[in-house]
Amino acid sequence: MPEAQLIRCPVCGATNRVPLEKIEQGLAPVCGRCKNPLPVSIQPIKVTDATFSADVERSPLPVLLDLWAAWCGPCQMISPVVEQLAKEMAGRVRVAKLNVDENPVTAERFHIRSIPALLVLKAGQEIDRIVGAQPKTEILRRLEKAIQQPQSTHR
């Protein structure tokens, strides 16, 4: 696991390198530029149509976006895997979840027709798509491959 997590300040937009040790100890990091508290979580973040741009498109890290719905059994099956990946990939990948029933604009933007769907995005651009419940090893393999690709090779 990396030694630091990159966290963008919601107030001034500065990218801050926060040691994972500090996060694991429950210490509250502050922005180096404006001194406001930084949002810290090794859990997936909840993304909405309204927050997609700030949370995903402007993320300094690649994003694994889990598109799901409450009624979807396979979505519930992979949810613990997505949570594990959020912890294991902290500092390398931002993991986010978007409920497609509550956020149809973003779901339509990416032409989501089947869930669960996991998208790997860089600067809001889709790099890879995994549809259906897959084992953690396959998701991790595809995620590692996608984040190593140059951004210009997106779909």
Question: Predicted segment positions?
Answer:
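Short cysteine-rich clusters marking metal-coordination/redox-active sites
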Residues: C9-C12, C31-C34
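Conserved redox-active cysteine motifs that mediate thiol-disulfide chemistry
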Residues: L67-V81
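Short linker/helix segments within small regulatory modules
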Residues: V18-P29
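Thiol-based oxidoreductase modules, predominantly thioredoxin-like and allied folds used
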Residues: S79-V105, I112
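A short beta-strand-turn-helix
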Residues: I45-V63
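Cys/His-rich microdomains that often coordinate metals
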Residues: N16, L38, S79
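Short pre-active-site segment immediately N-terminal to redox-active cysteine/selenocysteine motifs
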Residues: P60, L67-W71, S114
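Non-catalytic, surface beta->alpha helical segment in thiol-disulfide oxidoreductase systems
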Residues: S114, L119-S152
